[in-house]
Structures are given as structure tokens and as C-alpha cells.
């Protein structure tokens, strides 16, 4: 929006041309979203408290979590608002990738909002039934996948890239739709499963989102893409603005979500942010790198799958409780220790993911 204004004002003052630089608009995206999140956060928390929109806590979980009961939830709306406003202000709104990521983010956020609303407002402990949650996730995920497939200008944008193996590129054809569906829906649910401790999900999301923003910036520049031997995706660089907005909004939310949390993001935030990460990775053909960098999300998801499968097949549980962050809590780890150690793991995995840019 402001990019259009800057382009118009260039005829009066050439200095406005500086807003053409993606790096500047990415930084402005961070600062705008961060400011919005920090300024709107206290008001949103008070509003949620006044309306008694608080988190309910399971009795069979760690006893330390009982003190969290009543903490305002659905704070993901703060994250999405900050991301949306910042992106609309600083991104090139004629770029199709910007709209794809925004729409996927907000549509998955809508699913989470309905789930949270039914749990918190209607006092329905089930929330949105799982079959309907996965149905709508599938609908939105498939719509995004089909759109990206049918509008891909070249085969490069539907080819599977294997990190560190520069000569291995697998044309997916229609299989691109299937892969994209699983990446978007899978990452959405993985982040949601991780969102069980104060600040546990948001910081890895910020780190992975920031790293994916770097991939988007490099893939959108033909010289960088050719030098690094990564797919050149025209227009993908504009997603650095969305990535910046995600970083700013996430850090602003963490200000209130850090231990002991004043607000939880709820499904409205977790489902949306996970879907955003998956969509960005798909656009720049870095699904495998997302799997590496989002290792904490993968670990949390696998712990649930293993726990359920083991109990159904043998009647025994592998972990004391799943997702795995609760297992460590029940082993006696203080909550802040679990959180920070998972953050450290994410830092390491993100650095490994970024290293694949040169290890080819």
C-alpha cells in the first residue's frame, strides 16, 4: 500500500525510490508489526480478561499447569492482526505470493478461531470436532496447492529440491499438489502441538520464519539463486516483508507470552503460523529444509504419533505424556528449562538449514 504511495511520490522527490528496496521494507515490516503488537497487546489482554476468555487446563497434565487456568487465550489474533497490517502496508500488493501466504495464514487462523471460540466461549471442551478441523484444513491446503500448481510459470516451481545435492531435482508433476497439501497441513498441526508451554512455539516459529524469509529473498533474486544453485522463483523475494512482519509480531507477542505467560496464542495463532511456514517453504521449494529447521515441531509431532500408536498396539506408553515437552516436565524439568533448551535446539537446526545454501 505504502509502496504505491512511494512510487507516486517519486515524481516529486527521488528519495522515495528507497522504498523499492526489499531489505528496507523487510526491516520496516519487522518494526511495524513489533510496534503494533507491543502497543495493542495490553489492550487485547485486558479485553480478553474482561470477557473471561481464559484457558482451561487438563487435570491429567503437569500439576504446575493448574496455575495457568484462566490465563487469557486467543492471543493469536494479536499476531495475525500485526502481521496483516504490516504486510499490507509494506508489501507489493500486486505480488501473488504475498496474497497466497496471507490468505492461507488467515484461513487457517479462522479454523483455529472457531475451535478456540467453541472451547472458551461456548464451553465446549471438544472445540471444533477433529473431522471438521481436518476437513477445512484440507480444503484450504488443497486450494493453495492447486493454485500454486496451475499458476507455476515454470517446472522449477514444482520440482522437489534435495538439500546439499545440487544435481538431484525431482519433477513432481501433479504430485506437487499432494506434497504441498501435506507440508501446509502438517506444519500447521505441528506448530499447534508444540504450543503447550509459555513461549515454546512462538520463538521457534520466529526463527524458522526468519530463515525462510532469507530463502525467499535469495530465491527471488536471479543472481543469488544462480550463485547458490537454488531455484529462482520470480517474485518470491517479496515474502521477506511477510517474514519480517511475522518476526516482529512474534517477538511482540513473546513479550507477553514469555514465562509466566500473560496470554496464550491459542489455535487461532498456532494453526495460522504453522500454515504460513509451510506455504513459504513450498513456494521457494525448501520443504526438506523446513523439515530440518522445524525439527522441534517434527519431534513434538512424532512423539504424539509414537505415543498413540504404541498405546493402541501394545497398551503401553513410550512417554510419560505427549507431546514430548510434557514428558520432560513430568521428569522434573522446570518449564523454563524445557522452553530454553528447545529454543537452543531450534537455533542449531536453523543454522544447519541455512548452511545448506552453501553445502552443495
UniProtKB/Swiss-Prot annotation:
Gene of this entry: mraY
A GO BP term here is: cell division
Which cellular compartments is it found in?
Cell inner membrane
Which named protein is this?
Phospho-N-acetylmuramoyl-pentapeptide-transferase
**CDD domains for this protein:** GT_MraY (cd06852)
The UniProt similarity line reads: Belongs to the glycosyltransferase 4 family. MraY subfamily.
- Highest rank taxon of the organism: Bacteria
Physiological role? Catalyzes the initial step of the lipid cycle reactions in the biosynthesis of the cell wall peptidoglycan: transfers peptidoglycan precursor phospho-MurNAc-pentapeptide from UDP-MurNAc-pentapeptide onto the lipid carrier undecaprenyl phosphate, yielding undecaprenyl-pyrophosphoryl-MurNAc-pentapeptide, known as lipid I.
Give the record's membrane topology: Multi-pass membrane protein
